[in-house]
Amino acid sequence: MKRLFCLLLTGIVLISLAACQTNTDNSDKNGNNVDNMTTSCTKDSVDEFMSIIGEVELGGLSTGMKLDEEHCYNVTPLSVATQTDIKIFKFSDSCISLALIDGEVYSICESFGGYGFVNAVPWDYDEDGNLDLLVASSWGSGLHRSIISVFNTTTKESIVVYDTSTTDNPSVDLFVAAASPSFSSKDPQDLPVYYQVYSANIEVNGNNLADLSYTATGVIGSVVVENGTPVFKPMDD
């Protein structure tokens, strides 16, 4: 009986240790809860950004809209702001989304007819020492679709990794998050990072299309590097 009690006690201790070592919450590598997230949406550095691009009248299907300070917001995610000097700006009427990188302005995603920029995480996918951007966005008024892409900050080119228009659920909204398992006995810097893609419900706050909140509805896959190229890996692979 004493031996049985000892075995049971040992089992309980081992289970308790395992529970302490493994992080099972829905947090990204920065400790943010990925179940419910809100975009950063401020006026920080907007005047500086507008002094670079100037006020622009839009034409075509966007006639009547313009890139002006009134509709411009800084939507740089915290992880991007703390790890890089990149600033991301979005216009609340047209959803046009632009990045300020090393004093130059670049378009990082399509926007017409969708939310444009949704969110991004920094990721040196090609290991060249420069952090790139893994971006979630959407566009398309006739056929709403979400795009997962990588903006290479060295070549200033965008690589589409996943396009929902080719799937059986083209209108699903997406966001990205960098996640890593957490073990109390290890330095977090030594843990592998997983770049996950979540399906989401997106809400517009205060009729401002630059100010979004999104709630995760599930993990649909992850973005990994194969032969130097970022690729999307579905959950069922």
Positions of predicted regions on the chain:
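Structural motif
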Residues: 95-97, 142-151, 205-208
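A short beta-strand motif characteristic of beta-propeller blades
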Residues: 105-112, 160
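Acidic/hydrophobic-patterned starts of short beta strands in beta-sheet-rich repeat architectures
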Residues: 79-87, 127-137, 188-195
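Short loop/turn segments immediately following the C-termini of beta-strands
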Residues: 91, 138, 200
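Acidic, divalent-cation-chelating loop motifs in proteins
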Residues: 71-82, 120-128
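Acidic, small-residue rich beta-repeat scaffolds with periodic aromatic anchors
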Residues: 21-71, 75, 156-237
